[in-house]
Amino acid sequence: MRYFIGIASKNHIQIGQAGGFCQLCHGKAAPLKRMKQNDKIIYYSPKLTMESKEPYQAFTALGEIADENVYQVEMFKGFFPFRRNVLWSEIKRECPLNVAKTHPEWKAYASKLRFGHFEVSKEFFNFLAEYMTQDS
């Protein structure tokens, strides 16, 4: 099992949660193919919406890759992103970026937030997931 961070605006993540899927890197297939069934993903939202200039900076969703299928859909006319099915977990609270910064491995991952998708250690992933699933 591997552990990943995906990056997207919160409103885009909510669309995926409602539909039971994830998209990465503006619909590219390659990052989705790096993940396998039962791998875990946490999404980081730098902004509430893609158009917004105001920072949001929180880890906002937690899930598990449901199967081995990478598939393409027409989201709207002329846009055919690739997706993966995800079993989304219920979270009790989002994890602010400032909390993630307290983890000893943070410096190794900080610069990767601009890449859209990257693998993290089980320890770092569990640190975020535990924060997100515990009562405040």
UniProtKB/Swiss-Prot annotation:
A Pfam cross-reference name: EVE
Gene3D superfamilies: ph1033 like domains (3.10.590.10)
InterPro entries for this protein: EVE_domain (IPR002740), PUA-like_sf (IPR015947), UPF0310 (IPR022996)
Family: Belongs to the UPF0310 family.
NCBIfam families from the UniProt entry: PRK02268.1-2, PRK02268.1-3
Protein name: UPF0310 protein HH_1062
Organism: Helicobacter hepaticus (strain ATCC 51449 / 3B1)
High-level lineage: Bacteria, Pseudomonadati, Campylobacterota, Epsilonproteobacteria, Campylobacterales
